[in-house]
Amino acid sequence: MFEGTTIVAVKRGGEVAIGGDGQVTFGQQTVIKRRANKIRKLYRGKVLAGFAGAVADAFTLFDLFEKKLEESQGNLTRAAVELVKTWRTDKFLRRLEAMLLVADRERILLISGTGEVIEPDDGVLAIGSGGNYALAAARALINHTNLSAREIVMESLKIAQEICVYTNDFITVETIGGE
């Protein structure tokens, strides 16, 4: 289901970065787009979001999440919980196949259609087909270098694209906070 992308988020030193590759894969055999942007700034530029999964489903979830952010006046956790409640109980939305990584200056959250809203202990999170590779790389970089959040996201995505056939080297990164 989640083949075709890697999204990684890192929080470090007052900076939060989310990045993703640009590959869109049709089925398991055909790359149909190389330069997709799967990362967005939401809520007046104060929230970052990235998706893995079906593109149309993710756009539906982005729109719904943005509405929940407005309703909660930018409270990331409340908006995420409200999104999951709606996602799980609505007959149409329940069928959507995507995951979101969202972040503000304070936290990074994973939001899934199975009801999870998870905040990592270490300020590092990744999803998608190359997510495990990017997560391992980001954790190593955060523990053994002085790189910024943006640089860690970039480097971990580069490592993931060298390993995962569903991840490419067209990388988009957005940040909030920092210098």
From Swiss-Prot:
Q: What does this protein do?
A: Protease subunit of a proteasome-like degradation complex believed to be a general protein degrading machinery.
The protein's gene is named hslV
- Per its record, how is this protein called by name? ATP-dependent protease subunit HslV
Q: Which residues of this protein are catalytic?
A: 5
Q: How is its activity regulated?
A: Allosterically activated by HslU binding.
Q: Which PROSITE patterns match?
A: PROTEASOME_BETA_2
- Subcellular localization, per the record? Cytoplasm
Record-annotated residues binding Na(+)? 164, 167
Mention one GO molecular function.
threonine-type endopeptidase activity
Origin species, per record, is Carboxydothermus hydrogenoformans (strain ATCC BAA-161 / DSM 6008 / Z-2901)
Record flagged with keyword Protease = yes
What main location does UniProt list?
A: cytoplasm
Q: Which top-level enzyme class is recorded in the Swiss-Prot or TrEMBL entry?
A: hydrolase
Enumerate the Pfam families for this protein. Answer: Proteasome (PF00227)
Checking Gene3D superfamilies in the record gives: Glutamine Phosphoribosylpyrophosphate, subunit 1, domain 1
Protein family (similarity comment)? Belongs to the peptidase T1B family. HslV subfamily.
Its GO biological process annotations read: proteolysis involved in protein catabolic process
